[in-house]
Amino acid sequence: MNNPAYSLTMRDRLAELAPYVGNTPLYPIKKLFPSQKVKLFAKVEWQQFGGSVKARPAYRILRKAVENGSLDGGKAILDATSGNTGIAYAIFCAVAGIPLTLCIPENASKERKHILRSLGAKLEFTSPFEGTDGAQERARELALNKPHLYHYTDQYSNDNNWLAHYHTTAPEIWEQTGGKITHFVAGLGTTGTFTGTGSRLIEYNSGIELIALQPESAMHGLEGWKHLETARTPAIFNASLPDRVELVDSSASYEIIRDAAKYEGLFLSPSAAANLLGAIKVAEKLDEGTVVTVFADNADKYGDVMQEIFSNN
């Protein structure tokens, strides 16, 4: 029998968090890209409850699951993650009292593992060599074998992933640029940020160019990103949406982390740095325009990587 009081309590608790998700600042990049006619901005996505860009889809996915009764009977949320979506899930689930199980590659940073455990998430570790594809396989196995215990949200094929960006990220960018955005640049992981934001932006102005970024090779070290030629393409990805796809060098992305800290006061994660590098390359080819990218998270969860990068300074 369903427990309406249990579901209503979760619904109310999640609803209280709505003002704290999204509405992130749009930061102007001026020292690393000084230009009078071409403006470069980035959405600083770690400045919201949930700690990263993944707060947006995680929040929408959870709210819809509660509203649809998918968690009735005390089912746990189950999903695969490289870390950021998992952390956002864990934060929201802790507030709402929702049990959470996450399948995550074993090579996820120790900071992410510590945060997830501290927030009460149960972790299922998968092969580091299979990345998030392996984590998805394990999540599917658990959902298939124990359907009475889990609601598998599957962020890689869940339309609420990209819809979160369609309804929040894109309108924020449009308003913050005064409708002047000419190019949107973002890396591909679950592809939700690119798909949702890009789809809405071209509804505002069909002339906006959408440039997708991906790493140059399968062994790239950009946590959360996918090399689509060698990885499973997320079901939510609209391959016809990008005007073009640009490749980003991982080593150069790591190098720009130092410059972003020194000249812009930004402590960027590797994937945020890769977005910055890709956006600069796009902006450098323009005579005029407004380029916007997304800084998914900062470097707080990448201690070992940052120590290696900054130890030579």
Describe these PLM feature segments:
Residues 1-313:
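PLP-dependent amino-acid enzyme catalytic core
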